Amino acid sequence: MLVFLAAIAGKFCVAQELAYDAIYNFITKEYTLSKDGNVDYHYSSSLKLLTHQAFQRYFGESFIVYNPEFQKLKINKSRTIMADGKKVDSPHNAFNEVLPGFASGSVAYNHLREMVVSHTGLEVGATIEFDYNLMSQAKGMPYLMGEEILSFPVPVESCKIIVKVPEGTILNYKMLNLRLSPEITTAKGMMIYTWNFGKVEANPHEIYMPEASSYFPFLTFSTSPSLQRSLELFTNQPAFTDTRLPQTAVARIEQIKRSNSSDSKKIIQIRNLVINELSYLQIPSATIAFKFRTPAEVWESLSGTEIEKTILLAALLRQAGYQADIVASVPTHVLDTKWFNPLDINAYYVRTEIPEIASIYLSAIYEHPYNLLPNLYGNTLLLVDPAAESEKKWEIYPENSTIKVKGSFDIKSFSVEGKAELEATGRYHPFYRILENDKEINRILTGL
């Protein structure tokens, strides 16, 4: 009986392995904050390849994006242990620096680098051992921050996250979707926080999944001070304080102001100008140390990151005479109001006012026909303003949108004629299109 059960268990383990292209033996991520403010990120993993597809499509290369201006990359190990036990180290020409795809076409960010590591000696049954350090100087936000989502394309047998800070330094952290507290120890003047997740299942390969932080184990941590102080540090840079615009930008705004268009149409024209005439650079803020360019620099370069285009949009709207506030969106369940991790920001918007009509939210990176506020349900918005004397935040709650039609109609064989009054409440309507063109109401009525 014992032999029979052992055979079943063995077959089950083999079947479970073959359900995936590979399996991580372990993944360890370690963050170390030194007393001088520098941060060392140490990554180490061991990956067993189970299919040809594993190394032909998915795991044949590793990619590390970094910024040479304040970061130094050191690869400690890139080795393959073949199925017969032979060890093959990656040769010198297996390490190649390229420009990250998201920095393509940008002069301002063409110093960014992506290290492409080509693993060699790959075959079914081989194991890739990979280990590197990424050391960051104290530039930008003057504290440690990190964000880890326990989401992997294949299973992980052992996953561990370690954070080390000098004794006396407070590490703020929040764990979501999993009840797991860190093991806290001290050694050599450092406080060591260890989250041992053990075995982690592969993420489901399905479409229409919710945001990862809403159901995967999610860890966010930071040595930041209070939320207010963090926002002060965030906005203490010329990008937020030097809002001067080039003459070419001022001329474009004056041209829009002189038109006979309504205020709503002028606002949308300015928004579309930023969206359509400036390229969108999907560069993570952490990669540029949360240091952004001024509106003038962004305008003249014809490109910008999400936050840079948002800052520019706010500056252009103010130039046109409209109120404009920059806000950052953070998932409410992630935000802890006692401290702040800028990595938790998921989007930036401009809040402006259509005179005598409504307060609206605009994106600087994609067009939308309605007020974005309903889309922000489940998020808390933070005012990003260097002149703010205290933190300003507000949570977005769900809001019903309704359409009420009252009138008299003459129903004929192939048409309906009559007069009616339409009342649309809430914000989930093609708000901007209605203000620009009354006939947009006909399209709404057609769908009722």
Describe each region flagged by the PLM:
Residues 1-17:
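Bacterial Sec-dependent N-terminal signal peptides
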Residues 16-65, 72, 396-412, 416-424:
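Early extracytoplasmic/domain-onset interaction patches
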Residues 45, 126-128, 161, 270, ...:
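Cysteine-centered nucleophilic/redox motifs
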Residues 63-97, 155-172, 434-448:
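Solvent-exposed beta-hairpin/edge-strand motifs
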Residues 77-148, 179-216, 406-408, 447-448:
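A surface-exposed beta-strand-loop module
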Residues 135-288, 323, 412, 418-436:
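Secretory-pathway-linked proteins and extracytosolic
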Residues 307-397:
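Hydrophobic/aromatic-rich core segments of domains that either
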Residues 386-448:
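Long hydrophobic segments that form regular secondary structure
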